[in-house]
Each structure stands twice: as C-alpha cells, then as structure tokens.
C-alpha cells in the first residue's frame, strides 16, 4: 500500500501522554462498523520508549466489556512511520500533529479482498470537540492514496470505550 505523506521531522518525545480518539475513518466500513470491529480501538496514551519505539495504550470492546491493551510500535528509518504486529504486520504513519492539541495517524488495514485498505484516527489531547481540526482531518484524508471517509465521529462522546 502506498503510504500517505508524513511528518518528516516528528519528535517522538513530544507525542507522549494522554490522547483521546475523536474520529475514525476507514477505506472500508467493515473495518469499523461494529463495536467489536478489529480496528475500532480507542487510543488512551502514547509512551515513547528509550529506544524511540512507541507503546500505544488503547481500549477496545470484547465480549461486552472494554479491554485495555497495548501495542508496541517499532520505529523505522522514517521518524513518523512505525511497524506494529497487530493482526499481522502493519505500518502506522503519523500524518500530522501539533503535539499540544491534535494528531492524525493512519494504519494499513487490508480489508478482506482489498490490498491497500487504511484506517485513520484523529486524536486530541482533551475531549473538547474542535470543528476546525475535524475539517483539517477531513482534508488530510483527501490527500491519501486510497478513498477514505470519516465513519465514526466520536466528539458526541457516546462511545463506551472512550475515556
């Protein structure tokens, strides 16, 4: 899959701390369509490791409960691209962040029958909805090599796994 343009000068230390999933987008609705869909994960915290890998603390729904888990994202030569082993090897790329308010990232997500599916999220430091950033996220999605659209707008806060 062709990867989206990323932040070439990402400073991994500055993304540390609490984040909230505000919106999820995907190239295929099946990736996110149910509460237990495999990529419907809610990011809680990013923890850079001493070796510049990134531990991602997240929650997802399993058997009607929210399960906390973590994924270790291994750094690559590109500071904004990480490899994770989550249902197979996948690339995560950071599209954009200002470190203090928002971060957009995408993960390769081959849906059944497609090679280059993708799931993207808009993360925010607080739960306060920001329409400007949401529009910016939407514009960022339009630059991607695959057709992708916002499927879940979480700014209304109805999701149970979102803290």
From Swiss-Prot:
Single Gene Ontology MF annotation: retinol binding
Gene3D superfamilies, per the entry: 2.40.128.20
Source species of the chain: Felis catus
PROSITE patterns, alphabetized: LIPOCALIN
CDD domains xref list: lipocalin_beta-LG-like
Pfam family membership, one: Lipocalin
InterPro entries xrefs: Blactoglobulin (IPR002447), Calycin (IPR012674), Lipocalin (IPR002345), Lipocalin_CS (IPR022272), Lipocln_cytosolic_FA-bd_dom (IPR000566)
Localization of this protein: Secreted
SUPFAM superfamilies (alphabetical): Lipocalins
Protein name as it appears in the record: Beta-lactoglobulin-2
Cystine crosslinks: 66-161, 106-120
Keywords: Disulfide bond, Milk protein, Retinol-binding, Secreted, Transport
Record-stated family: Belongs to the calycin superfamily. Lipocalin family.
GO annotations of cellular component type: extracellular region
Subunit text: Monomer.
KW Secreted (keyword) present: yes
Superkingdom of source: Eukaryota
Function: Lactoglobulin is the primary component of whey, it binds retinol and is probably involved in the transport of that molecule.
């Amino acid at each position: 899959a062709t990867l989206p343009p990323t932040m070439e000068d990402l400073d991994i230390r500055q993304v540390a701390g609490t984040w909230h999933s505000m919106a999820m987008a995907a190239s295929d609705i099946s990736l996110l369509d149910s509460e237990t869909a495999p990529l419907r994960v809610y990011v809680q915290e990013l923890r850079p490791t001493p070796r510049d890998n990134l531990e991602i603390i997240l929650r997802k729904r399993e058997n009607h409960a929210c399960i906390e888990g973590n994924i270790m994202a291994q750094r690559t030569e590109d500071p904004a691209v990480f490899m994770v082993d989550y249902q197979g090897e996948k690339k995560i790329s950071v599209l954009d962040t200002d470190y203090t308010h928002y971060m957009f990232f995408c993960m390769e997500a081959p849906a059944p029958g497609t090679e280059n599916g993708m799931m993207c999220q808009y993360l925010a430091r607080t739960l306060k909805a920001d329409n400007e950033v949401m529009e910016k996220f939407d514009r960022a999605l339009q630059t991607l090599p695959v057709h992708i659209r916002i499927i879940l707008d979480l700014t209304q806060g109805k999701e149970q796994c979102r803290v």
